[in-house]
């Protein structure tokens, strides 16, 4: 039996929109991108959204925007796509890997003993992490939270969409994610970075 990795389902309306964009707009950016950014920001519940090339790019850009750099210590869980830790190394910062909850695969803040300059919790497999424990830790240490919501489009934590409940939320639309749009990603923010 052949089991597809993902199923491509395109409506005629979707195909027409792609062709219209290719024929009438610039290849990168343009009216469709601006419209998507605005609509996705409204959907998530943030004021700002910026399209970038990948989830890794969104995470990387968020670290720069928050002023993190060499020798910053940034907490992230062990159970994630490599981009969560790679973006930290890309700015010459130190990833502090922490354990996860066995039950849901998300970050276990009880395993964090180190102080840090930021934290990147990951909402894994569309399942929000225990964000209250993340927020308490961040507030106690006065550090920013960058949500890796690359696998959690539309997931909610206490009636709020993930990606909107921290300083910055990062999403990926890679074809293997639970929501795909060619190869683009979004960086969400409540404040102008």
Please identify what each model-predicted range represents:
Residues 1-26, 31:
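N-terminal "arm"/small-domain region of PLP-dependent enzymes with the aminotransferase-like
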Residues 26-73, 87-91, 97-99, 160:
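Phosphate-binding glycine-rich loop
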Residues 51, 76, 178:
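Conserved SAM-binding loop
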Residues 64-149, 156:
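PLP-dependent aminotransferase-like
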Residues 147-180:
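Conserved active-site segment immediately N-terminal to the catalytic lysine
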Residues 182-193:
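Single conserved hydrophobic/aromatic residue that forms the stacking wall/gate
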């Amino acid at each position: 039996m052949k089991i597809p990795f993902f199923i491509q389902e395109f409506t005629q309306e979707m195909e027409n929109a792609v062709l219209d964009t290719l024929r009438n707009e610039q290849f990168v950016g343009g009216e469709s991108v601006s419209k998507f950014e605005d609509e996705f920001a409204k959907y998530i519940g943030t004021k700002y959204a910026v399209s970038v090339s990948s989830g890794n790019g969104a995470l990387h850009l968020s670290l720069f925007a928050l002023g993190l750099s060499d020798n910053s210590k940034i907490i992230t869980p062990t159970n994630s796509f490599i981009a969560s830790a790679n973006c930290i190394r890309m700015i010459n910062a130190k990833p502090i890997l922490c354990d996860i909850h066995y039950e849901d695969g998300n970050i276990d803040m009880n395993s964090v003993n180190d102080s840090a300059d930021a934290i990147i919790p990951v909402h894994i497999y569309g399942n929000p992490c225990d964000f209250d424990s993340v927020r308490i830790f961040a507030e106690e240490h006065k550090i920013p939270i960058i949500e890796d919501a690359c696998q959690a489009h539309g997931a909610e934590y206490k009636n709020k969409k993930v990606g909107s409940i921290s300083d910055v939320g990062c999403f990926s639309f890679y074809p293997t994610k639970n929501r795909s749009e060619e190869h683009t990603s979004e960086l969400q923010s409540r404040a102008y970075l």
